[in-house]
């Protein structure tokens, strides 16, 4: 971890937000944030493990949500792609139904509202259901659509609602012109860039293991779409991250 952090620092990354998928991994993410002063944590149970959100797990998440090193409730959301499939996790369990995922999502939304933390959304092939739930649930202070990968009409609807689009390495992929258009039209205060490490490695390193040091390639692509210098885009998204997460990034 130290080497990855050093490589990130060397290219101007001022902080890292780490996540877990299950409750134990989320607790480890928060422990990492306690140990490293430039690492923060998002705390939640991933939708592919929504069936594990028991009463005990909810209490553990509630305690983590109010921790000062927790800056967001996430990743939570809906994932239709993995339903009925084994994600390859060690537990061997299949991803539960959308109904089970929705119940967990609504808990996480309430938790974001209670704690005042941003809501970090994972969405895979569940646009309509996700927009429905977000529309009729309580509204957190900020909603981040993590690793935004949806069609342009979903981007426009999300931006109209005030959600933040967070672009990962797939915005650099040749086929994803609609993602680049979304990056062009997003208001400046509603845009972030991220790695989604170890996945979604941007060009020209696509296929390699992703890490925070590669986020500059994603930022450069988004900057080009918006007609900005990479440095200007970097300052923009750093300021947005500091505001949304409520942290000091040395601006």
PLM regions and their residue ranges:
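Mid-domain alpha/beta scaffold segments of enzyme catalytic cores
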Residues: 3-251
């Amino acid at each position: 971890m130290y080497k990855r952090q050093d490589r990130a620092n060397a290219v101007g990354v001022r902080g890292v937000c780490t996540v877990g998928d299950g409750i134990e991994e989320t607790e480890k993410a928060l422990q990492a944030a306690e140990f490293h002063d430039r690492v923060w944590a998002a705390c939640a149970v991933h939708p592919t493990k929504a069936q594990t959100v028991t009463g005990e797990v909810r209490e553990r998440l509630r305690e983590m949500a109010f921790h000062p090193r927790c800056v967001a409730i996430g990743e939570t959301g809906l994932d239709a792609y993995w339903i009925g499939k084994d994600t390859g996790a060690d537990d061997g369990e299949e991803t539960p139904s959308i109904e089970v995922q929705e119940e967990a999502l609504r808990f996480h939304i309430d938790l974001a509202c209670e704690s005042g933390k941003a809501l970090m959304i994972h969405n895979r092939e569940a646009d309509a259901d996700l927009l429905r739930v977000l529309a009729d649930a309580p509204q957190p202070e900020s909603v981040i659509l993590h690793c935004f990968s949806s069609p342009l009409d979903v981007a426009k609807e999300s931006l109209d609602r005030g959600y933040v689009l967070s672009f990962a390495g797939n915005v650099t992929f040749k086929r994803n012109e609609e993602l680049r258009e979304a990056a062009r039209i997003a208001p400046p205060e509603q845009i972030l860039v991220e790695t989604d490490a170890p996945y979604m490695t941007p060009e020209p390193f696509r296929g390699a293991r992703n890490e925070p040091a590669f986020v500059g390639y994603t930022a450069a692509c988004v900057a080009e779409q918006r007609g900005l210098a990479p440095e200007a885009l970097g300052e923009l998204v750093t300021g947005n991250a500091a505001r949304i997460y409520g942290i000091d990034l040395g601006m």
